[in-house]
Amino acid sequence: MNWTKLLFAISAVICLPLYGFLSITRFDAQTGFLTAGTLTTVFYAALAVLAVLMLAGSFLQKKQLRFSIFNSRLLAVLAMVLGGVLVLCGVFDLLNIGYAILDSLDFLPAALLSGVLLSGAQAVMAVVSGIVFVRLGVSFLLERIANRSSITFIFPVIWALLACVEMFRDYPQIAGMPERTLYLLCLLCFTLFLMGHSRILGDVDFAKGTCWINAFGFCGALFGLTMTVGEVLCFSSMTLPLSDVLLVFALSLYCLAFSFNTYADR
């Protein structure tokens, strides 16, 4: 039995409805924080403990874990959806950056310029990463994924890391903002998931790749789906842009679907 898969199911049953309830009853729209209380503490503790157990279970079972793709059609759809959302988000961000530059063309402070460059690089990487996932989706559809070049997956890794840096820049108090903390954790897990993802598709150190996608794929899906549930239930006071919510949802589903191909030998 794959312990991580079992722990993910338990985590989803506990954390998703609990965070949804807290988002409705304990969320302060003005501060972006959850009000302190027993349930809030229980949620954070459960999320942290279960995530650690998922990681530990995967690494303890490393030698027993195996990987075999049995849902290539589903992965094809999810990869193309994720790629499409990434491209749309990147293009939208580039247009906004272009308009911002045109509006302040006469006077662009150095501090603002560095932010524009970071946002621009992140948007470009989003577009390139989207193209990578669309191509991967086509490969899944045609069932031609053996020995796929893993070098192209450096672009999604760069995009995710730039998105994390941009989030820290815009929200220094991110640790107290549950939806952005979950977003950040999802991106970090996605980055590490891609390390295993590229090893599997490139057929390089397959065992290590299987362990990494099993560990970080399920954790990333847990963080992303938990965040999505909270944002959907608090749609009227949603603090994240709708595009980000859709992106995290698509990203989480892809991580989950890919990681579900792992199993443990008896």
Segments (PLM) and residue ranges:
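Juxtamembrane "helix-exit" motif on the non-cytosolic side of transmembrane helices
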Residues: G20-G32, V91-S104, C164-A175, M227-S237
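Membrane-interface helix-boundary motifs at transmembrane edges
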Residues: K63-L74, V138-I151, L201-C211
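C-terminal transmembrane-bundle signature of multipass membrane proteins
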Residues: V13-L22, V52-L53, R180-R266
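N-terminal membrane topogenic signal
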Residues: M1-S11
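Alpha-helical transmembrane segments of multi-pass integral membrane proteins
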Residues: S11-L18, A76-D93, S119-R135, S150-E166, ...
